[in-house]
């Protein structure tokens, strides 16, 4: 059953909207541990196959890239995939978050839809 997951990228790094529950990574992450960062992202994306995933980006580019890569690898290689992956970035001017949709897939042609969506909307 499809769920909507609202999660921070890294725990307790910034103020989060009330809808956010939990984080993919702990507050302290070793940015040089690419293998560990990648494994965490892979496990998270597999656990949320079929879900609408909203990630509130709270720092560490290396972690953001690992999450996007994990989702795209699932799209390219397996039937398990997030239904939607949207990154939410903080706007200092407004104090709100704004979306960047990375994957928007419905059913069978999710890879093609994701590529076309990204190419024309990003």
Where are these regions (language model features)?
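Long, low-complexity, Lys/Arg-enriched
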Residues: 1-54, 66-122
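Acidic, metal-coordinating catalytic cores used for nucleic-acid/nucleotide bond scission
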Residues: 57-65
């Amino acid at each position: 059953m499809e769920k909507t997951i609202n999660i921070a990228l890294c725990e307790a790094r910034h103020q989060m909207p009330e809808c956010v529950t939990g984080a993919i990574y702990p507050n302290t992450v070793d940015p040089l541990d690419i293998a560990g960062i990648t494994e965490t992202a892979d496990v998270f994306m597999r656990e949320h196959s079929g879900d609408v995933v909203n990630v509130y980006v709270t720092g560490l580019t290396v972690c953001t890239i690992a999450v996007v890569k994990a989702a795209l690898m699932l799209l390219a290689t397996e039937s398990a995939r997030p239904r939607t992956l949207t990154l939410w970035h903080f706007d200092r001017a407004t104090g709100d978050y704004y979306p960047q949709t990375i994957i928007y897939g419905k059913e069978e042609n999710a890879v093609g839809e994701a590529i076309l969506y990204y190419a024309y909307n990003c």
